[in-house]
Design a protein with these regions (language model features):
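DUTPase catalytic domain/fold
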Residues: 2-167
Length: 167
């Protein structure tokens, strides 16, 4: 992943990108256990975040609740954080993020939380320290929106919602 060094505000993590460029991001752990985001493999896109809860929480089918992750982040300007569900929780147990994908702006400094919803048919229990979500740090491009009277033509046109695979 990169180098770690303690700062007064928390932890500063230096992340090396595939292109060899790195960014540093400060993380403050507010959990008793001090859960840090962890990449299981060095090339993983997302870093796992853990449930900062005092006791197990069981989500019944169609039930949702917020989970603290025990961290606050200072995402560098020019980037944003994307919070996604871990694929194993979605595919094996029917858990999803209530907002599908959480966006964390670089100016946000509060606790990172994940609202999980059980869309499965069985109750599922989250235990303290379970890995519940992934944090991705992504470059942010700010577009200038220009209102026009008519959009230019394209090969695809107005086809959408599976139209390119239609027989």
């Amino acid at each position: 992943m990169g180098s770690r060094r303690r700062t007064r505000q928390g932890l500063s993590i230096h992340v090396e990108s595939v292109l060899g460029k790195g960014i540093s991001m400060q993380i403050e752990t507010v959990a008793k256990e001090g859960f840090l985001p962890v990449r299981v493999h060095p090339t993983d896109a997302g870093a796992d975040l853990r449930a900062d809860i005092p006791e197990p929480v069981t989500l019944q089918p169609r039930e949702s609740t917020f989970f603290n992750t025990g961290i606050e982040v200072a995402i560098p300007e020019g980037y944003f954080g994307a919070l996604a569900i871990r694929s194993s929780l979605a595919c094996k147990h029917g858990l999803m993020l209530a907002n599908s994908l959480g966006i964390i702006d670089s100016c946000y400094r509060g606790p990172v939380k994940a609202k999980l919803v059980n869309i499965g048919r069985r109750p599922y229990t989250i235990n303290p320290g379970d890995r519940i979500a992934q944090l991705l740090i992504i470059p942010c491009v700010h577009a200038t929106f220009i209102q026009v009277d008519e959009l230019p033509e394209s090969d695809r046109g107005t086809g959408g919602f599976g139209s390119t695979g239609a027989q």
